[in-house]
């Protein structure tokens, strides 16, 4: 499954581009991805994790493309139900907690960091040792492929 997430008003929107069992031609939908600000990373990771845990496959792997900035601050949202900003230490801690929770449930989680070097320390706090820093997108498939191979070989 390939999906993205963003906040729209009071809602976190999960957009599914491709499902697990879709035909190979569905991969074209991935190119419909557009970036968006305001992301409740912890909630999206928790939701994606529940989807994985419901699957029958033995190995469960979640790959998260991240900029290292979990951030959702309500701006110009009249009558918003959740006015508490999601940013800074609280957002980082929430995201890291959801990652640890999934790992405790034996889901392998890889953070793929494509952000700025100044945010690298935050990425380490969120993902611990299992993250890859992608400086050049051309290396994405090679780096993620190595991680997938390693995860599939463990106890395999």
Annotate the PLM regions.
Residues 1-156:
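Acidic, glycine-rich A-domain
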